[in-house]
């Protein structure tokens, strides 16, 4: 055969490489984690303070059930699913279930002023809002101002549902109850939006930033290289950086890619709780903003 530059006629078609010709999608990342690192543990503090344990295979299974449940509700590719939640197990499962099915995960910072919460949720156009039970009081006073939210998913079991005057509340367990895990993810364009984050609005209104599947997978690869974070299957990552803050620096996705263990602190971010978690789980890597580690060091040195 003739190759371009080696006797190929002028105007000959450009050759296309077919090695690993597949899109870079988040679904492929969690599938890889389940297949190659399925038994690698994830530990997370629940809303009631107790810890729960799972592994990457379980996260893939529950992510598949989330995807099937969203399809059952008529959620279409590109629709936004918002979260108002801490670093807990259901939030991690939503990270993969929502995005792998082609929806957009819109993480919202619960520390923002109510007016900013309203603006961000309305501007993002989320159809569903997934809320930790201890954060429901943030939603109750603003629910009448939300223009696109059709249903609120409370991230707990049916038996743990808190009392609330909010309409259309469904527990997380009810959402995925009876749903079969989606065996194969739907076809998703690697350049399609996967997650949506907003700036804090220090100048003017908050501004949305969309991440793509492709950019997320490339960030995963970068985070696992030696001259970046050098994350690997040998690590236990204490993920203090909030899941609602810049996709927790992309680390949940990178941990799935390399098969690292994750330790999620929930809402217990005081130095004593973080030290107990990191020491108990033998964390090798911690991610958090400087103020977190300054108080952490003070606690350790006392």
Stretches with model-predicted labels:
Residues 86, 131-141, 158-159, 241, ...:
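Adenylate-forming
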């Amino acid at each position: 055969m003739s190759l371009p530059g080696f006797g190929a006629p002028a105007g000959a078609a450009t050759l296309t490489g077919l090695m690993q010709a597949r899109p870079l999608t988040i679904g492929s990342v969690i599938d890889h984690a389940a297949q190659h690192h399925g038994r690698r543990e994830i530990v997370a503090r629940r809303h009631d303070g107790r810890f729960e344990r799972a592994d990457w295979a379980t996260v893939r299974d529950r992510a598949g059930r989330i995807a099937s449940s969203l399809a059952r509700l008529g959620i279409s590719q590109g629709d936004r699913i918002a979260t108002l939640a801490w670093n807990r197990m259901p939030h991690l499962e939503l990270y993969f279930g929502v995005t792998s099915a082609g929806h957009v995960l819109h993480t919202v910072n619960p520390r923002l002023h109510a007016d900013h919460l309203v603006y961000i949720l309305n501007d993002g156009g989320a159809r569903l809002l997934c809320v930790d039970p201890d954060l429901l009081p943030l939603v109750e006073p603003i629910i009448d101002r939300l223009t696109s939210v059709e249903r609120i998913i409370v991230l707990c079991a049916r038996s743990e549902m808190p009392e609330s005057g909010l309409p259309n509340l469904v527990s997380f367990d009810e959402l995925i109850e009876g749903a079969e895990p989606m065996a194969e993810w739907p076809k998703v364009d690697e350049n399609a939006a996967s997650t949506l984050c907003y700036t804090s609005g220090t100048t003017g209104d908050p501004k949305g930033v969309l991440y793509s599947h492709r950019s997320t997978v490339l960030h995963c690869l970068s985070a696992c290289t030696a001259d970046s974070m050098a994350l690997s299957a040998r690590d236990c990552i204490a993920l203090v950086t909030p899941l609602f803050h810049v996709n927790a620096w992309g680390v949940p996705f990178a941990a799935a890619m390399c098969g690292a263990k994750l330790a999620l602190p929930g809402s217990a971010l005081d130095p004593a709780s973080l030290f107990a978690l990191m020491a108990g789980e033998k964390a090798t890597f911690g991610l958090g903003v400087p103020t977190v580690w300054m108080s952490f060091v003070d606690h350790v040195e006392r």
